[in-house]
Amino acid sequence: MPKLKTKSSVKKRFSVTATGKIKSTQSAKRHGMTKRSKRSIRVQRGTTVMNQSDSRIIKLFMPYSR
């Protein structure tokens, strides 16, 4: 049986934690930041853990992750 390929777009955008959760950067921070408060800009600087239903889909595209 041939090896399964990992989607390159998923490989660049998401990472898997040691417990198996999917971690990604915050979305909606490319442009239009002048309309937002400083607090919302600061909160979006970090990363977030995806919910269970979305992470199940992402794990299908990364067959060799934990």
UniProtKB/Swiss-Prot annotation:
Keyword flag Ribosomal protein: yes
Keywords of the record: Ribonucleoprotein, Ribosomal protein
Keyword Lyase: no
GO cellular component: cytosolic large ribosomal subunit
Source species, domain of life: Bacteria
UniProt feature, compositional bias: Basic residues: 28-41
Compositional bias ranges of the Polar residues kind: 18-27
Chain intervals for the UniProt region annotation (Disordered): 18-41
Pfam families (alphabetical): Ribosomal_L35p (PF01632)
GO MF annotations in UniProt: structural constituent of ribosome
GO process annotations (BP): translation
Family from the record: Belongs to the bacterial ribosomal protein bL35 family.
PANTHER family: 54S RIBOSOMAL PROTEIN BL35M, LARGE RIBOSOMAL SUBUNIT PROTEIN BL35M
Protein name, entry field: Large ribosomal subunit protein bL35
